[in-house]
């Protein structure tokens, strides 16, 4: 089994963190300011997270948004987590994408309800 890149984070500068989770800028951003929030404990997806880990992700999500709003001034956000290879997950360590969106940018993600 290969080592999990989100457990080691080689060469990655931590943007924000709390006791159970941390945030850093995505190495392959969809847009300017794209951040990933990951749990410090290695778990493969959001459904394995404890209530405490979910709360820590929520806490960082708010703090990340505040910082990105100050620096990048986006017009909106996409926030999400892929679970399983069929959904597009390629790194099997829980991570939540926080993707700032800007008026007129390409690649709009739309979920139909």
Segments from the language model and where they lie:
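HIT superfamily nucleotide-processing domains
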Residues: 1-113
